[in-house]
Regions:
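Membrane-interfacial loop-to-transmembrane alpha-helix junctions, especially the N-terminal start
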Residues: 19-25, 56-59, 106-118, 158-159
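Eukaryotic intrinsically disordered, low-complexity segments enriched for acidic and Ser/Thr/Pro residues
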Residues: 82-83, 95-99, 120-123
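Start-transfer (signal-anchor) and selected internal transmembrane alpha helices
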Residues: 1-31
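Membrane-water interface at transmembrane helix exits
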Residues: 74, 78, 103-107, 154, ...
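Membrane-interface micro-motifs in multi-pass membrane enzymes
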Residues: 63-67, 114-159
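Membrane-helix interface and helix-disruption motif detector
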Residues: 79-89, 107-110, 129-141
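Transmembrane-helix motifs of polytopic, lipid-linked glycan transferases
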Residues: 92-109, 147-152
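Membrane-interface coil-to-helix junctions
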Residues: 34-94
Length: 159
C-alpha cells in the first residue's frame, strides 16, 4: 500500500484476518495442527529411519563431510518426532524463524511485503513433508541456515 493510500484509508476498518498478527497466528496454529494431526512426525521418523547418538564415532561420520553438521543437527531434531506434538511444535518453530528472518531481510532490502508472501517457504516445506520420502529436517534447516547467513551479511558493519 502506498503512503497516499494509507492516508485515504485511515478511517476505514481493515480486515482483521487478512492482515496483522491474527492472520499470522491463525496460519502457524493451522500449520502446527496440520503437521501434528495429518502428517504425523512419528511416521516421518519411521519412514526416514533417522538415528542419533551422542558419541564421538557418530559425530565423526558427520563432521568429515560437507554439510555434515547440518545433517547432525537434523538428526538431533528428528528425535523430537518420537512425540507427534513435539515434532510438530519444533518444526513450526523452525518455520516461524524462517518467517522472521525473511521479514527482516525484506526490510533490509527496503521493501514491504504482506505476511502471506513471507509464509510461502513454509507452505512449500509443508508440501514436501506430505511425500514422506524427503529428508524432513534437512530442508527447513538448510533454508534457515541460508537465510541466517544472508541476514548475517546484512548485519556486518562496513560492508
Amino acid at each position: 500500500m502506498r503512503p497516499a493510500d494509507a492516508k485515504e484509508n485511515r478511517g476505514q476498518p481493515r480486515s482483521r484476518f487478512g492482515s496483522g498478527a491474527l492472520g499470522l497466528l491463525a496460519f502457524f496454529v493451522s500449520f502446527f495442527l496440520y503437521v501434528w494431526l495429518r502428517i504425523e512426525p512419528g511416521v516421518l521418523l519411521h519412514a526416514t529411519g533417522t538415528l542419533f547418538f551422542f558419541s564421538d564415532p557418530f559425530w565423526k561420520t558427520f563432521s568429515s563431510r560437507p554439510g555434515g553438521v547440518l545433517d547432525y543437527v537434523a538428526a538431533f531434531l528428528a528425535q523430537s518426532d518420537h512425540f507427534n506434538w513435539l515434532g510438530a511444535l519444533v518444526l513450526t518453530a523452525v518455520c516461524f524463524l524462517i518467517f522472521l528472518i525473511s521479514r527482516r531481510l525484506v526490510t533490509f532490502a527496503g521493501g514491504v511485503v504482506p505476511w502471506t508472501v513471507l509464509v510461502l517457504p513454509s507452505l512449500v516445506l509443508l508440501l514436501g513433508l506430505n511425500q514422506y520420502q524427503t529428508l524432513a529436517w534437512n530442508m527447513p534447516l538448510g533454508l534457515l541456515l541460508s537465510l541466517a547467513a544472508a541476514l548475517g551479511w546484512f548485519l556486518v558493519p562496513g560492508k
